[in-house]
């Protein structure tokens, strides 16, 4: 069956010193961290003890008793989740590669060939110029072009995407030698010309401006074709590939197409300097309206099969179409892990972190990417397995295609597809491998390739690879390997997290649960690491409880925390101060500012009470066979005014959604409770009345402070990104009765 070419089982020889090093933090630093964590855990235990030993009596209406029990349940969960997160962070590791040793140990001819997969699905949502900038960036890797094979999967089967790829194949003849001659970084032409305003060292102004003009001309032609929707006659006459499209073609109903635009085996496939070009292949798998196509997972599996007959490289790298290569040496870095004879035999994939170029300083959405990349993921790596992101990942083909690791197995890095056929025959073979019926009654998507039947197919695929005995590696080089685009509106971000949360929750409730699938196969610490995300959804209810019930009790004068003068006040204060101080220190250590840390805390709260909550509801509705709630936003903010507001630190709302209603309701409720609660205490009891309600008052004030962008969007802003009046009206309908009942009580 297509997909892999087998390996060889034989002894190996160590070629000199190691190709990579694994480093751990200093003992003193880890000891200090663990002592700090131990003191916080002691505080958590004291909080649990206080809740259990000071349970209010059940007299009266029992409101305080029930509220107290709810606080106990929430704090039990927060404590458990904190311990889970802490356990994962117990043994971080950091990787360092030695590319100079790689060059000494392996000649260029001995290095393996690499198949690179780029996936796109919609030319409207993913503009063709964005796609080809990514394609050109990976075509220009600092690697032998004869050993590079780039495959573009176009699930829409769009003739526009094919036309743009044809344009890119011509531009590559100029761009690739320019990049290699002057060591250009990054090698996405769009990113390079946007960032660099002058020629690189050694390049004359005339040559640089000529290259820039070539790129501008291509961009103008592409944009003209995309805007008109019509393909010029010249490319149609000169490329046999265009003849496969007809008026009956749609994105959901079209035959399979495989076109080899550049064949590195042919003498004519050279750049302007006469050097070979990488192989470039366009693929659109067959689509039929009533046939399941499994989205991105199906696309990747189709690429695995097509590549197996054209190139069959032992290394596969896949990248999303909006995440270009920012480091031309990423392949060589990844090979340092795979080709190390002593340490690399069991490495199944090497995962690079996700980084984004459009995140501004003091980002209002507090993207925690630095902390995640610098702290969280190295800790997962320390337990023997970074998860598979779905992009920016180098795979061992054999591991991806289902091979179980054994110590006797040794990879044949020199193997390639045994090509005796010409391009036409290869294309015909490729088309037969990507029909709608090819996978019927096979193990594709079950035991082979990327997994089907789960929302986060990349995560479950990586987990299954690890359960087969393979190890994964996380590598975060100084110069980022890949750069992409992240959403810059609140709605887009919350929908994205809702999708991720649903996926992780469904994995946790299925046979793919790390504790079930990974039992006895991967370390307990790694199982817990996967579960940190798997339990995102569970955080929603305790968090929603904690930001509403204490505030309502404060408004009613019901105390849920110890007095400021009580000894029991100390563990509450210590846990809060110590935990947030540690979080701030970690954020600053990773290069974030204090403002970015504060914004990240806001988004942490917002995600828990919106994305996580609705993801949980939708997941259980699906389990019960009830239709989904339909809370997902579909509006995408792309206009220049919205981008300007983002750069100014203004949250982008702009449309009605259930998520915004929940967020606004919580914000208005706490504002009302703070104002009315403090007024009630001062008028009825004086300043001394706050002694018993001090922590609740602080909590209420903090929630109000963290929701300041919501109040700004409600009361001060009048732009298109502000909160709609309909959101405010619905929220007031929830808040007003609660406040009236409390006041009249």
From Swiss-Prot:
GO BP annotation list: cell wall organization; cellulose biosynthetic process; plant-type primary cell wall biogenesis
Assigned keywords, A-Z: Cell wall biogenesis/degradation, Glycosyltransferase, Golgi apparatus, Membrane, Transferase, Transmembrane, Transmembrane helix
Positions of transmembrane segments: 29-49, 66-86, 541-561, 568-588, 658-678, 686-706, 723-743
Source organism of the structure: Oryza sativa subsp. japonica
Principal location listed in the UniProt entry: Golgi
Pfam hit, one: Cellulose_synt
Family: Belongs to the glycosyltransferase 2 family. Plant cellulose synthase-like E subfamily.
Region of interest called Disordered, as start-end residue ranges on this chain: 1-20
Keyword hit for Flavoprotein: no
Residue numbers annotated as active site: 155, 458
Location in the cell: Golgi apparatus membrane
Name of this chain's protein: Cellulose synthase-like protein E2
GO MF, any single term: cellulose synthase (UDP-forming) activity
InterPro entries listed in its UniProt record: Cellulose_synth (IPR005150), Nucleotide-diphossugar_trans (IPR029044)
EC number: 2.4.1.-
Function: Thought to be a Golgi-localized beta-glycan synthase that polymerize the backbones of noncellulosic polysaccharides (hemicelluloses) of plant cell wall.
């Amino acid at each position: 069956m297509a997909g892999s070419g087998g390996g060889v089982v034989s002894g190996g020889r160590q070629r000199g010193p190691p190709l990579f090093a694994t480093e751990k933090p200093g003992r003193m630093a880890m000891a200090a961290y663990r002592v700090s964590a131990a003191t916080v855990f002691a505080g958590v235990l004291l909080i649990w003890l206080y809740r259990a030993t000071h349970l209010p009596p059940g007299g009266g209406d029992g409101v305080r008793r029930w509220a107290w029990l709810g606080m106990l349940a929430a704090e039990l969960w927060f404590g458990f989740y904190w311990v889970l997160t802490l356990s994962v962070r117990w043994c971080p590791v950091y990787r360092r590669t030695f590319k100079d040793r790689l060059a000494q140990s392996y000649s260029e001819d001995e290095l393996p060939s690499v198949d690179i997969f780029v996936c796109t699905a919609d030319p409207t949502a993913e503009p063709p110029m964005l796609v080809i900038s990514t394609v050109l960036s990976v075509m220009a890797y600092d690697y032998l072009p004869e050993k590079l094979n780039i495959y573009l999967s176009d699930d829409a089967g769009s003739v526009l995407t094919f036309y743009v790829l044809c344009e890119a194949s011509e531009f590559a003849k100029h761009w690739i030698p320019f990049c290699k001659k002057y060591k250009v970084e990054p090698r996405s032409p769009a990113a390079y010309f946007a960032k660099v305003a002058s020629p690189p060292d050694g390049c004359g102004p005339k040559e640089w401006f000529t290259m820039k003009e070539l790129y501008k001309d291509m961009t103008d032609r592409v944009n003209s074709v995309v805007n008109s929707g019509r393909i010029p006659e010249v490319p149609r006459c000169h490329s046999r590939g265009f003849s496969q499209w007809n008026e009956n073609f749609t994105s959901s109903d079209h035959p399979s197409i495989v076109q080899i635009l550049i064949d590195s085996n042919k003498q004519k496939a050279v750049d302007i300097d006469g050097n070979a070009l990488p192989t470039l292949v366009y693929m659109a798998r067959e689509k039929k309206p009533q046939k399941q196509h499994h989205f991105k997972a199906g696309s990747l599996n189709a690429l695995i099969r097509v590549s197996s007959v054209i190139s069959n490289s032992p290394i596969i790298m896949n990248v999303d179409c909006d995440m270009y290569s920012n480091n031309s040496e990423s392949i060589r870095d990844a090979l340092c892990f795979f080709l190390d004879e002593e340490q690399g035999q069991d490495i199944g994939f090497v995962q690079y972190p996700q980084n984004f170029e459009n995140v501004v300083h003091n980002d209002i959405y507090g993207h925690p990417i630095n902390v995640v990349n610098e702290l969280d993921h190295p800790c997962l790596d320390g337990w023997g397995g970074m998860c598979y992101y779905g992009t920016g990942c180098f795979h061992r083909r054999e591991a991806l295609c289902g091979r179980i690791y054994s110590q006797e197995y040794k990879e044949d890095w020199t193997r390639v597809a045994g090509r005796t056929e010409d391009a036409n025959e290869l294309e015909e073979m490729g088309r037969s491998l990507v029909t709608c019926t090819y996978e019927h009654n096979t193990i594709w998507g079950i035991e082979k390739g990327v997994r089907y039947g789960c929302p986060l197919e990349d995560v479950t695929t990586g987990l299954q690879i690890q359960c087969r005995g393979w190890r994964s590696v996380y590598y975060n080089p100084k110069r980022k390997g890949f750069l992409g685009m992240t959403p810059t509106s609140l709605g887009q971000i919350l929908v994205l997290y809702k999708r991720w949360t649903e996926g992780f929750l469904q994995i946790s409730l299925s046979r793919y649960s790390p504790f079930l699938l990974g039992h006895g196969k991967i370390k307990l610490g790694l199982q817990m690491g996967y579960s940190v995300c798997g339990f995102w959804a569970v955080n929603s209810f305790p968090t929603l409880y904690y930001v509403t019930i204490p505030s309502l009790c404060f408004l009613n004068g019901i105390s849920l925390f110890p007095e400021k003068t009580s000894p029991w006040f100390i563990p509450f204060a210590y846990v809060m101060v110590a935990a947030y101080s540690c979080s701030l220190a970690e954020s600053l250590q990773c290069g974030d500012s204090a403002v970015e840390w504060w914004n990240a805390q806001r988004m942490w709260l917002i995600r828990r009470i919106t994305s996580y909550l609705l993801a949980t509801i939708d997941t259980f509705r699906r389990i019960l066979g009830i239709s989904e709630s339909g809370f997902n936003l579909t509006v995408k903010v792309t206009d220049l005014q919205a981008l300007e507001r983002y750069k100014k630190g203004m949250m982008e709302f702009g449309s009605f959604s259930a998520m915004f209603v929940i967020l606004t309701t919580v914000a208005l409720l706490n504002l009302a409770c703070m104002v009315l609660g403090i007024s009630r205490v001062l008028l009825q009891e004086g300043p001394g009345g706050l002694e018993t309600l001090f922590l609740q008052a602080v909590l209420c004030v903090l929630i109000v402070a963290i929701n300041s962008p919501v109040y700004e969007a409600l009361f001060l802003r009048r732009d298109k990104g502000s909160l709609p009046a309909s959101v405010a009206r619905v929220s007031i309908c929830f808040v007003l009765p609660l406040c009236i009942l409390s006041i009249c009580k």
